[in-house]
Amino acid sequence: MAWRPGERGAPASRPRLALLLLLLLLPLPSGAWYKHVASPRYHTVGRAAGLLMGLRRSPYLWRRALRAAAGPLARDTLSPEPAAREAPLLLPSWVQELWETRRRSSQAGIPVRAPRSPRAPEPALEPESLDFSGAGQRLRRDVSRPAVDPAANRLGLPCLAPGPF
């Protein structure tokens, strides 16, 4: 059966058929690939799941706890009252010791330097231990007479060889 210009159905059904096939190619809706299925308390990747999965409390709760343990806020430290400015920082003991040592030595006018490493210093090379006597001659020989292999080319023209001859 051939299609005739006066017949209905064939040309109009072709675009519909193409649209139907295109819709069949579209994937079915599914859950987001980045969400954890284990439990609703886990966050998605968009909310840093790897960092927050181990926490049992809300991040807002532990942020409040950290803020309370840190002492006065930064705007309180700018106040002219000496008690607010001299509030101790909550640093590890070894950091506080280093800070106090640096502060005492800078008040005394002593320059502060980092401690030297326990490794012994490497000896410096002295000029007489370096031998450059044959370096210039080898360089001149390599430049003036390059290694060639005349048999490598069928035309008989010399070619640079990969190794010294």
UniProtKB/Swiss-Prot annotation:
This is Neuropeptide W. Coiled coil: none annotated. One of its GO terms (molecular function) is G protein-coupled receptor binding. Residues 1-32 form the signal peptide. Keywords: Cleavage on pair of basic residues, Glycoprotein, Neuropeptide, Proteoglycan, Secreted, Signal. GO terms for cellular component: extracellular region. Glycans are attached at residue 133. Plays a regulatory role in the organization of neuroendocrine signals accessing the anterior pituitary gland. Stimulates water drinking and food intake. May play a role in the hypothalamic response to stress. NPW23 activates GPR7 and GPR8 more efficiently than NPW30. It comes from the Eukaryota. Residues 113-127 have a biased composition (Low complexity). Pfam families: NPBW (PF15180). Residues 106-165 are annotated as: Disordered. Its main location: secreted. Detected in cerebrospinal fluid and urine (at protein level). Detected at high levels in the substantia nigra, fetal kidney and trachea; at lower levels in testis, uterus, ovary and placenta. Not detectable in many regions of the central nervous system. Also detected at high levels in lymphoblastic leukemia and colorectal adenocarcinoma. It comes from Homo sapiens (Human). InterPro entries: Neuropept_BW_pre, Neuropept_W_pre. Belongs to the neuropeptide B/W family. One of its GO terms (biological process) is neuropeptide signaling pathway. It is found in: Secreted.
